[in-house]
Amino acid sequence: MGIQAAEISAILKEQIKNFGQAAEVAEVGRVLSVGDGIARVHGLDNVQAGEMVEFPGGIRGMALNLEVDNVGVVIFGDDRSIKEGDTVKRTKSIVDVPAGDALLGRVVDGLGNPIDGKGPIAATERRVADVKAPGIIPRKGVHEPMATGLKSVDAMIPIGRGQRELIIGDRQTGKTAIALDTILNQKSYNEAAGDDESKKLYCIYVAIGQKRSTVAQLVKKLEETGAIAYTLVVAATASDPAPMQFLAPYAATAMAEYFRDNGRHALIIYDDLSKQAVAYRQMSLLLRRPPGREAYPGDVFYLHSRLLERSAKLNKEHGSGSLTALPIIETQGGDVSAFIPTNVISITDGQIFLETELFYQGIRPAVNTGLSVSRVGSSAQTDAMKSVAGPVKLELAQYREMAAFAQFGSDLDAATQQLLNRGARLTELMKQPQYAPLTNAEIVCVIFAGTKGYLDKVPVKDVGRWEQGLLKHLRTNARDLLADITNNDRKVKGELENKIRAALDTYAKDFA
């Protein structure tokens, strides 16, 4: 069969057209077995630990177990479409996520993909999900308050910017409510800050292993209040694979570090880390890593310590930014001595302990002030708050102690009776409805009233009504006083004390 001249020229043209094109080289392996979200892959000899790999159909996975003849890969997605013999490609990049201001107001998954139906995200940069925490030299002591708007927290368990404060308690004790109120409370501060980025606080909420309906409800609340504008929600829900629930906190922290490293302030809420530990346990057991206490792997402490150490307050040379963390841990039957709770308590700078019993007594937020502590203490409070909040914790502690004794004895001396009366009113004063955060100045005035005896003659059942009336009075007739406390931070004594007393006296006369 002869070759025609036209064919020769066509072949030559084709060869010339393809000349100089480099062949695309991809390192590939083959799936040996797949199941339970784990794939064993042979042939990826040069893969790095934590590297992203790609399966057919665009499904991604992360190489975790690097063994002699195969690699254990956890799959970020549905493993039903992956079968034995499929090719797996190296991406040559460690798991990274988008970061930047474009993420604010959005809901994303553990890899930073939008899941809110509002279109793609134009992120300015990408950051590696699991990075090393800042060292000792770039850090600075926590000294700026991070207001939650909750009287019991801001007065007795103050949280500072750059602190890690654990919220711990049984299910249905109001852990998420405290976190959500903290996000909502930042709205007034962010609006007052205007263009001053050093005063604003951006919020990142990470939902780990929660029901989708719960996350949808939370996002709806953020949208209704306008808080979504400065908030990012990262959701790895109960229906997502375990690797996604494991990765989401790291990915969200990388997104939050963008603010910290640019001299701004961010707050990250992990809701909750118990479920991340369970997801990690599932992955580790399926990867055949040896189990330890409560079947958790040996490095479960490192899982949480390397995550929470990334929250820090940076010094001036590094931009003065901060990342504050509020990790949430769910206990079983109030047992704080279980493995994961004790681990996280030892990593964090204090804990807010919520009790079922208090919750059902109607004391909400159900904070057990005896077991709760902030290891940063009053250095994270304003001078005004510091001067009025000091006696509260002591008086409540004495009240709890005396209340236990008073059950046995009937005849009490006047001093003890006075202590019990004051304690009952202070306990009532610490109650606060959800979605009603107070400003720092309002809390100062309310606590001052409680500790200086303004409530001693008010019946316990009327304390809530008295407080609501006082807040209304302050917001309408004493705006100058609230502005003074906010703008000129100083101890409550002398002139300022007289101003507060005058406002309280005026209100006390009118209250009936």
Swiss-Prot record:
Gene3D superfamilies on file: 2.40.30.20, ATP synthase alpha/beta chain, C-terminal domain (1.20.150.20), P-loop containing nucleotide triphosphate hydrolases (3.40.50.300)
Binding residue positions for ATP: G169, D170, R171, Q172, T173, G174, K175, T176
EC nos: 7.1.2.2
Subcellular location: Cell inner membrane
Site annotation Required for activity: residues: S372
Reaction equations catalysed: ATP + H2O + 4 H(+)(in) = ADP + phosphate + 5 H(+)(out)
Pfam families assigned: ATP-synt_ab, ATP-synt_ab_C, ATP-synt_ab_N
Alphabetized GO MF terms: ADP binding; ATP binding; proton-transporting ATP synthase activity, rotational mechanism
Top EC category: translocase
Membrane topology, as annotated: Peripheral membrane protein
Cellular component aspect of the GO annotation: plasma membrane; proton-transporting ATP synthase complex
HAMAP family recorded: ATP_synth_alpha_bact
NCBIfam families: atpA, PRK13343.1
Subunit description: F-type ATPases have 2 components, CF(1) - the catalytic core - and CF(0) - the membrane proton channel. CF(1) has five subunits: alpha(3), beta(3), gamma(1), delta(1), epsilon(1). CF(0) has four main subunits: a(1), b(1), b'(1) and c(9-12).
Function: Produces ATP from ADP in the presence of a proton gradient across the membrane. The alpha chain is a regulatory subunit.
Family assignment from sequence similarity: Belongs to the ATPase alpha/beta chains family.
Listed name of the protein: ATP synthase subunit alpha
